[in-house]
Amino acid sequence: MATAMQDVSPSFTSSPTSTMTTISTTTAATAAAAPKPDKPRKLRSACDACHRSKTRCSGGNPCTRCHEYMSPCTYSYSSRCGKPKGARSRKTLEREQRVAAAAESARIAGNPSALASLPATSTCTSTATTAAAAAAATTTTTIATTTAPSQGPAVDSAAAAAAATTSTVASPRADDCLGLFDDDEESNPFFSSGSENTGGTSFSPDWIPPLPSISDSDLSFPLLESCLGPDHDCNDSLFWSTTAEPDCQPTSKEPLDPRSKLLRSCKCLQTLSSLTARDIRRFDATFVFVRNYARAFSAFYHCSHCPKDAGSISMAVTALQLATTALEKTATAGTDAAGFKSGCSGMTAADLDEDLLTPGAEFFLPANGRGASNPAFQLGSYQIAPLPGEPDLEEHSEILNILIRSAVRRLLAVCWQIWDLLRGPASRDGRGHVFEPYDPSSSSSSSSSSFSSGPEIHQLCDLSCSAEAAQFRSTLVQIPARLCNLLAL
């Protein structure tokens, strides 16, 4: 007897996995062989008459409605349509397979030693896929019982990698329906690090307003110190982003004088001209105006049909001055809101006409004197204002600071593009133009070139000696300085 026990005990304890597999297989076979008892069908809680008329039934036989109308009160069985409970569709299985494949690739990328076991991993993946399809058909759970204990940590790590991948892909600005931000701003050091001399704060996506990150064709303006310095890299992706040539054709094939027929020459000029005649009535419209102007000028800059003459560039500079003035008023609204509110009553109609805020404008001023440093701003359907009882909330100024920095970046990029257009014909890329009377050859320019070296402020004095160029030169020297002053507010 003792010998028999010694022979049986080792064989019983040596293969727990095979024993669990046998038990699971037997249980699954028994469950599959035994037919499931049909659940008793339930009667509707409403009678047939109330069900057809879609009215509330009081229940009973007869119900109140059938008793009132003296009609027969009968109850029928409810008919259930659709898939049975727990069934999964083909698209659900495909989505789960894609998630599992992404988790596996993330695990392999994070663990280089796993590359040696790639065939085994592929086998496990295909086995898991086949098992998932079988589970959807038979709704049994024998796969979970037959899984080896050593595969548990691998499955947990794959699930964790899938969760990390999903959280990484999610954008903190998925609801930026106004497109006030760019995709490259998050990785730009100009917005990702604070500046001591400008008083800027660190760029943190945790408190950014839920304003898609719509990728537009604006040029990315890099860090100011790196641009104006001698060691900047113009081939960096943060310096200029590649922009495709817009599909813009002239409305007429005959050569048009842009000075007399400006609006007939190109769609880009029409858009730019409409921006110069626009009146910015509200502070929150400033950021939208800057975005639209930067996009319109970028299309004009890269369009091969738009004439790059004095009239076109003068129109662009006018819109740039309008955007800069509006941005200055928006940036200083917090410090000057109290004085502006007290002085509105003494302003005349002429004063209001000269200001960007016209009498029909909706003034975005603080609700009380304590909130003078944090005026309310409305961006689309989002209201950015200090909470009641907390007028000195720092998040409001942080959000406004990020929006102002984004607008400054766009306008500085426009300044650099205008400088590129003002360069002489001896420039390295051939995009420069001389301000002479109308020259038909100036109506086309290369759209794929970009200047190879960043301009400096003192180089703006080397432009043409014409009156138009002198005026543009003085403006382009002043506007970047005004924009840089906004970063110190």
Swiss-Prot record:
GO cellular component, one term: nucleus
Keyword presence, Transferase: no
Region Disordered, residue ranges: 1-20, 188-207, 432-451
UniProt xrefs under InterPro entries: OAF3, Zn2-C6_fun-type_DNA-bd_sf, Zn2Cys6_DnaBD
Outcome of gene disruption: Impairs the expression of the majority of genes in the gliotoxin cluster with the exception of gliT.
Disulfide-bonded cysteines: none
Function of the molecule: Transcription factor that regulates gliotoxin production and contributes to virulence.
Name of this chain's protein: C6 finger domain transcription factor gliZ
Organism, scientific name: Aspergillus fumigatus (strain ATCC MYA-4609 / CBS 101355 / FGSC A1100 / Af293)
Upper lineage: Eukaryota, Fungi, Dikarya, Ascomycota, Pezizomycotina
Gene name linked to the record: gliZ
